Amino acid sequence: MPQLNTTVWPTIITSMLLTLFLLMQLKTLNMYYHPPASPKLMNIKPHNNPWEHKWTKIYSLHSLPLQS
C-alpha cells in the first residue's frame, strides 16, 4: 500500500505548500486594491432648534419633585 510509505511524505508536503504559496501569490497580485479615500471637508451648518434657547433646568425631568 503506497500511502503507508512515509519516505515521500516530506517531499509531497513541501511541494504542496510551495504550490499553494505560489498560487496565493498569483491570486493576490491580480487583485486591484483601491487607494484610501482622502478626507473631504464638509460645510456643516449648526441646526437652530426652537427649544434649544428656552430649555432650562426647570423643565428637566431630574429636577422635578417626586410624585407619590
From Swiss-Prot:
- Give one GO biological process term: proton motive force-driven ATP synthesis
Please give, as recorded in its UniProt entry, the membrane topology of this protein: Single-pass membrane protein
User: Which domain of life, per UniProt?
Assistant: Eukaryota
Can you say where in the cell this protein is located? Mitochondrion membrane
Q: Name one GO molecular function term.
A: proton transmembrane transporter activity
Q: Which residues carry this modification: N6-acetyllysine?
A: 54, 57
In Swiss-Prot or TrEMBL terms, this protein is called ATP synthase F(0) complex subunit 8
Q: Which organism is it from?
A: Symphalangus syndactylus
Q: Which gene encodes it?
A: MT-ATP8
